[in-house]
């Protein structure tokens, strides 16, 4: 089996690549080739090839997706705050990039499997709680609108038999390793990651702010399970909510204290940032993932697990 991860240089892409290599199989078939592709050459990984791919450029996409490509994980995107600030670039990457990948897959005529990552940012506006697979997508930000459009494309290309598609609306992934990015949700990892590493972090919202979370470890497990779901079991809508859990910022901090003690809490500064609050307070959190749960995908049992996974998998060693 030949697998391509577009967005293979990112946190989830790197972890997904490593897990697939560890398994050696996908859907019961041996992985013969794994390619990590991104806008810049991803970090090298033993057992995988790396290449550059600009999904906004059809020629670049065509060079990456070959007739031998069996499975495409489409993870690449520009994130929420960036897409909000740069309207044109958001649509160029998040909408037209998705179109370019699907159109290349269609042109091959081989019906590759496409696993698309959407986002809980598709929810918003006047849709009624609780939200889930059949809720109206009514994002109040450009990033969510672009992801909603991507879901519709994946559904239509799948309906026409051009690809074997499936899409998953990711919860906010926390605790993410690395450095803060331009996502409005970036602080939802940094207020834990930085203090766990002995560094100060700023929280721009109050402790009562509620959100919907999943750990990187569970996200990767779910993407692999999602790729292995039989096409017949997906139904007419091949895109669905990935399971997560709702917690407040205060509960996240309490979980960190339970796992790592009281010292990291002293490194959090609570400072309101209206430009971030304006985005994240438009997001929704009362979200249910009934379809994915029935298909075998899972959420973390507690946020203490999320903290432990970061310490086990990602915390830099002194």
Residue spans of the language-model regions?
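Glycine-rich "substrate-gating" loop/helix at the edge of Rossmann-like oxidoreductase active sites
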Residues: 171-185, 205-218
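Conserved Rossmann-fold NAD(P)-dependent oxidoreductase catalytic core, especially the SDR/UDP-sugar
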Residues: 99-141
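Mid/C-terminal beta-alpha module of Rossmann-like enzyme folds, strongest
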Residues: 218, 222-277
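Amphipathic terminal alpha-helices
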Residues: 272, 284-294, 301-318
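NAD(P)H-binding glycine-rich loop region in Rossmannoid oxidoreductase-like domains
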Residues: 55-93
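Alpha-helical substrate-binding/gating segment
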Residues: 188-202, 210-239
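Conserved beta-loop-beta element that borders a ligand/cofactor-binding pocket
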Residues: 151-177
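N-terminal Rossmann NAD(P)H-binding glycine-rich loop of SDR-like oxidoreductase domains
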Residues: 3-26
